[in-house]
Amino acid sequence: MTNFTRREILAAFLGAPIALAACRRNTAPPFPEGEIVGTSDVFGHRLRDGLRVEVPSDAWTNVPIVIVGGGIAGLTAAWHLQKSGFHDFVLIELENAPGGTSRSGSNRVVSYPWGAHYIPAPMKENVALVSLLDEMGVLEGKDAEGEPVVGEQFLCRDPEERIFYKGRWYEGLYLHPGATEEDKRQLDKFNAELGKWITWRDARGRRAFTLPVSTCSDDAEVTALDRISIKEWMDQRGLNSPRLVWWVDYACRDDYGMTVDQTSAWAGLFYFCSRVAKPGVESQSLITWPEGNGRIVNHLFEKGKDRVQLDRAAVELIPKERGVEVVTVDREGRNPRGLRAQRVIFAAPQFMARYVVRPYRDNPPAHVGEFQFGSWMVANLTLRDRPKLSPRDFPLAWDNVLYESPSLGYVVATHQRGRDHGPTVLTYYYPLCDENPRIARTRLLEAGWREWAEVALTDLERAHPDIRSLVERFDVMRWGHAMIRPRTGFMWGTARREGAKPFRSIHFAHSELSGVALFEEAFDVGLRVAEEVRLSLV
């Protein structure tokens, strides 16, 4: 985007009114130091374009199980295999660090997330996740009803959320100040509708919406919600309050990288209902760390790091009469090696399978094209001090949102440390919600470090006029395939079901197969597929 003016760049990502106001203020750089970090887009494009290598005959190794992909699903599969007493496997990860969109970073100030940054406290029914958190030392036993008790230091501390609107910060994410009686009536009606679905059970006693998705009801009354968007569902009920629509839209952009017009009504209701135990109670408390879900990544990685090969890519999976040949190279596409596996757990997205699984290259299954991914820009801003706060403002929270901004705002990495003064790191999230995911990826990648720094700083400057003087470093990560998009018709269409079926000796395990890109889903599919593969070898 080097040929565009500052105003044109700001208008493209923040809208014309913000761009015009910013240019009138004439608060252009100086810029802080920083860079674009992270994912190997160049190597991924080489795979897409048909990278081919030959493995020398003396560079082959036999191993029962190969796991392709070191995100949460792949790491969970490795964790489960080891807990089950199975240690003869190899995990291949292209990047120099595991975790996928749950990875994290650190500097002299604090550790910080590069993507996913919390999980809701699990309910007792999620036995495996409760077991993991107990192993991590996060839990302190059970309450009288058998629900896990999370240690206070791991729960998101107050204040949790605030929203910026017309020059002031307010508590919470729904904009209560200035709400009309009609706004309030519609909010109450929306919550009543949610209560009905939270209470709902099918003939087998299953909830309509719960975590993980694999335990949700597939009753026709529930799956019918996937045929319309959440905006259409709201319109049918007269729920058109601008504040309410914005709040639901924010939720969809936050969890799915999609707008209310794009998001399936099933997915929209899932967001609000799956984390609530019963009507009238708060959503499950949030578990978080300074580095977000990177804490879980580090725990899982440490459990099996001697079986993980980082900076190594699986470039071809060749199904044989018995087993699979896995061709791997380093990040430069050199040093080819081969693994002869009895089973492969493909813990990478379906769009990669069409380039890596040899039979898919010439004749990819129809379902592969149904998996669409959203693009995100995540930036970490290292500040020498906190932005100034007006006495009338609600104080700095963990999650800080700008009303009517296309961004999601930022989380504060030092919040869990209990430090409310001095240096900090703000993690800023910007989902690209274009209707066409390819256009979104093009916009993401065409904007360089300077453009993204200008977008984020201009956006934040509305709430923090002193932000530019406080930023010491501004680093960017561009996620071209950040998360699956649960668009209308996808959740209960055929693609997820077909994508989950093994192809000969290749078993698929990625959060996309649940339709929503949440930690619980990646954990669940990694667990289930690892057990499926383990039992197949017994």
Positions of predicted regions on the chain:
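Dinucleotide-binding Rossmann-like beta1-alpha1 core, especially the glycine-rich loop
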Residues: 109-197
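Mid-domain catalytic core of redox enzymes
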Residues: 310-425, 463
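N-terminal Rossmann-fold NAD(P) dinucleotide-binding loop
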Residues: 74
